[in-house]
Regions:
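Charged catalytic cores and adjacent phosphate/nucleic-acid-binding surfaces used
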Residues: 6-175
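Extracytoplasmic mature domains of secreted/periplasmic and thylakoid-lumen proteins
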Residues: 2-3
Length: 175
């Protein structure tokens, strides 16, 4: 739980062999805890510094009073068995979600997102502003973004009408 644990980017950058990091943890949110459930800012900072980490979301259920079954990963496995699931995880064929579905295409110059009906599709990079970074709904099902030369990483986030999110893992840009 990077945000809940107050992990500093400098600490994370020293780690080796990290397969993924938790972008959202429901039990690290109110009413069970303080509002430190969302670690996307920390993970964006780490990606901007050259260490893009695949993003996962979890419930980390301790209480079972509403935090359970709210965060998970959607997985693109060829079959429903251990080997296929592990293969999909190792190859990065997954994304974190609270419900929204998404498919992300990256061709080296444009990121395209196809998603379940959403209020927003937001593209995040190391740059603080870009004119076409947010696609607005209601009910949008696709968006795309072409990063500029100064942008070093890129990821997408889908937000539905209920405020639930889906997070694509960041990619390093070599433009």
């Amino acid at each position: 739980h990077p945000s809940w644990s107050l992990n500093q980017p400098a600490e994370i950058l020293k780690l080796h062999g990290v397969d993924a990091s938790e972008v959202f943890n429901s039990v690290s949110n109110v009413p069970w805890n303080g509002c430190r459930a969302d670690s996307s800012v920390i993970l964006d900072t780490v990606a901007a510094l050259g260490m893009p980490l695949p993003m996962v979301a979890s419930d980390d259920s301790h209480f079972y009073t509403g935090e359970e079954c709210t965060n998970f990963i959607w997985l693109q496995a060829d079959e429903l068995n251990f080997d296929a699931i592990m293969d999909a995880l190792k190859k990065g064929r997954f994304y974190a979600s609270q419900g929204p579905k998404m498919a992300v295409e990256w061709d080296g110059s444009t990121m395209k997102v196809h998603c379940s009906p959403a209020k927003y599709v937001v593209f995040y990079t190391n740059m603080v502003y870009s004119a076409k970074r947010v696609a607005k709904g209601p009910g949008i099902t696709q968006a795309e973004y072409q990063p500029g030369a100064q942008e070093t990483f890129l990821r997408a986030e889908v937000i539905d009408e209920q405020g639930r999110k889906a997070w694509a893992s960041p990619v390093i840009l070599n433009l």
